[in-house]
Structure formats: C-alpha cells, structure tokens
Amino acid sequence: LSIRRQRQMCIRDSKYNNHNLKKTIMNAPILKKMTKEEIEGSYKDAICNMLNRNKIGGRIIEKWFNRDKHTGAFDMNLVKERGFYDANILDVQQALHSARGLAQIEDAGEELISHSYVLVNDIRYVDATLKRNLQGLGVLLGMMGSAFVPIAGSALARTIGETGVAINDLVVGFKVYVTSYLFKLDWNEDVANDFYSNLWYDNANIEMSRKQLFDNQMGNYKLTYVGCATVYSGETSLAGVKNESDMFLKVCTRSIDKAISELQKSFDEFKVFSPLISTSPLCAHIGLKEGVGEDSRFEVLEKVLDSEGRTKYERVGIVKPMKGKIWDNRFMASFEKEEGFDLEYTTFEKISGRDFFPGMLIREIK
C-alpha cells in the first residue's frame, strides 16, 4: 500500500470544511542536510511558487462559486450552505444595485472566502535503523510520491525479511517529522469588487466574454504564506494497529492534527470557532486533537450584525476546560482507552462573563 494513497486518507480534519481540490499530492525534492529553519525557508518559497504556478487560488474561487465546467457560470450555493445565509441576501445580480446588498455579499466573502487556506504537509521519515536497512535496498522513505510501506507478502517485504528486519520492527519503528505550511487566499475588498463587477455571471445570464476573461485571470488569484509548524510523532501506541497501513495512518494523522493545533496557537486567523452545543453542561465538540488541555482558555463570542448588516463577534465571557472532562478525540483513541476516550465532548466552566447560550462560539486565547 503506497504512502501516497494513505497520505490522502489522513489529511481531513472535521473541524474545517473539506474544500479539497483534485491536486492534493506533490513530489518533494530531496534536500541535503539542513537546519529546521533552512528547510522551512527553502520549502515555503518553492511551495508558494508551485501553488501559484498551478493557479490554485483561481481553483479555490471556482470551488467556492461552484463554477459550471461547461458554461463557466457561477452560483452561491456553497456559500449559502457553508455560511447559512438566506438565498435572497446572496443574490449577486440584485446586490450589485444597492450599497447594503453589496455589503452583505462582501460580508459573506469576509466570513468565508477570505478564510480559505491551503495546508501543505511535508512528512519525513526519521527512524535511523529502518532508514538504513531500506536505503540498503534502494528505497528512501520520507519523500512524498516515492515512498512505500512494505506489505507482508510483497517482494519488498520478503527481501527485508531476508535481511533480518521483522515487519513488526518496521511498524514499531515508524516515526515522522511533519512540517505543515499554511497559505491563505488573498481575497480582499478590491479583489471581490472586481470579481463581482467584471467576472461574475450565472446560468441565467451567460456571458462567454466573461468566461474567457476569468480563464485568463485565474492566475491572478494568489496565495500568501502565513507560517509553518514542525512536530515530531514520537512513540505511538500500537493499540488498534493491525498492519503497516494502520500504523502509517495513526502516526501521520495524529502528527498532522498536532501540527494544525500548533498553527492555531500561533496564528489567530487560523483558529477554529467551535459552537457551544449546550450550556448545562457547558460543552463543545473539541478536545485533545485540537490541543485542548487543563491550562487552555477560551473566549466566548456572540455573533452580531452592525447597522450595515455586516457580521461582528463580541466577547461575552471566558471559559476553561474542567479537569477530567477533556474529550480524547484523537485518531484511534478508542483503542487506547485513555482518560476522556469515552466522552463525546469537552466540558467547560465559566471564568467570567454573562449568561451563555447554545450556538455561541468559543475560540482559544493565549
């Protein structure tokens, strides 16, 4: 089973909308020994260039506005679905004729489209013993697109067996470094106004000249670098692991989740808003996977509209997780049965603030 295939299976985080494009895997160049800072610096520029060269920003716009592959027309269905907006509010043709309507369209863009991110995960194998044995067979683990986990019964596995390396030893020794590079779609008021005024059309108003214009300008939608986080998988419990594929998924999924958690702590704009699902008890569907610990603190936010109909978030209080009530929602946690694995949410207690209501949002603070 190829690492490429397994890699595709372990990147989806339910706390973020799945906005995946068709292109999700790329080959990483083999670099000579570098420091962590040198690797991150070299890769971020190469990745950013690759993303922009492949017009990933334009493809994100196509995805958001559900572009028709035949007519090139757009619609707001996905924006309505993701943002729970009323259909009449997001009628672009009507909105262009009123300042308030345009403000609400821009608000939808600010709420959703401008918070479009691309996460590129560089996974590198680090176990010296296994790497040395496999390199002797001409296999280099750790570079995406060229690495495979040997399956029992395969020619590679049999060869490894002949060298005296047991399959179980391979599984136990599987450790990785994951560096997650975060990029953000450059979507601002000027870009949005140009799109809606000069490029937008729907299937009721086909304009082939605009289709050609958007096709020509897809490369103008850029992604900018936000930052990166590097984590080490360390030792991983074998609970629930039946084969090499399971181990790869468990190690890499947990490492990527940990890297995402580190990015959230470092960059406020990337932090997830989680709704309170109840106030008795006070709880939300986040846990260890998101890096929640006893020392974590969260602000409680209420969504309000200003006089122009734009969304704002006002802090109404601060809460903290209750000891022994933190949900262990890590990948395959049910097999390890550590504290919190049998919970369905994390329970919080109020530090300050007024009354809270279900649906209010919480966001981690430093």
Listing of model-derived features with the role each one plays in the protein:
Residues 1-11:
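Single conserved hydrophobic/aromatic residue that forms the stacking wall/gate
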Residues 8, 112-114, 173-178, 279, ...:
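Extracytoplasmic
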Residues 27-165:
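Short, solvent-exposed, polar/charged sequence segments at loop or secondary-structure edges
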Residues 116, 122-235:
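Amphipathic beta-strand/beta-sheet edge segments enriched in Tyr/Trp
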Residues 191-247, 268-272, 276-285, 300-366:
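Beta-strand/loop-dominated core regions that host nucleotide or nucleotide-derived cofactor-binding catalytic loops
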Residues 246-270:
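Short, structured interface segments
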Residues 292-294:
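Short, well-ordered loop/turn sites that connect or cap secondary structure elements
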